[in-house]
Amino acid sequence: MTITEVRHWVFDMDGTLTIAVHDFAAIRRALEIPEEDDILHHLAALPADEAAAKRAWLLEHERELAYAARPAEGARELLHALRERGCRLGVLTRNAHELALVTLQAVGMGDCFLPEDILGRDEAPPKPHPGGLLHLAERWGVAPTSMLMVGDYRFDLECARAAGARGVLVNVPHNEWPELADLYAPDCRALHGMLG
């Protein structure tokens, strides 16, 4: 199946559909998380009271970023072209669902997705776990092999690989993970151009 034949596309949000603005090092410092630890995994391992307080801080920090979000180069045009082709579109993000909705509205992409096709960290295990992609495949009644996962980081590609989907790397200057990326495009505009 070529990229032009794919009808089921799942996108990461931050850094893929939007310009990446999260300062993960600053978030780790504010939450007293070791720099080598994954933020979400670290919070999940904390005692309930401490985790709740830190999750609340993270949610408020992300809310500020959501309202100020800006679209990634060519992302809106890519999504609208895919919708015109009759493609089913989903979002799989490590962000909170409610903030994903805010972000997508802020960047003019809210009309491209059904709310139930937007999975955040509370609806699916955080990437690189494949659970979110597998959930969308089941919901859409398709095999994961017929899906593309588009993202800007190795977690997106690892998620695709683990689910049996194909991974597309975008919005980075070069392909840092050629062993994981089935396709690479420097940005969403270039990916749009590959559709023909």
Predicted regions and their residues:
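Active-site neighborhood of HAD-like aspartate-dependent phosphohydrolases
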Residues: M1-E50, A56
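Asp-based, Mg2+/Mn2+-dependent phosphohydrolase catalytic module
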Residues: M1-H8, H97, T103-G196
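A short acidic, glycine-rich active-site loop
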Residues: I39-L43, E64-L65, D122
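Short, basic/glycine-rich phosphate-binding loops at helix/coil junctions
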Residues: A51-E62, C112-D117
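Short, acidic loop-to-helix structural element flanking the phosphoryl-transfer center
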Residues: E64-V91, H97-L101, P130
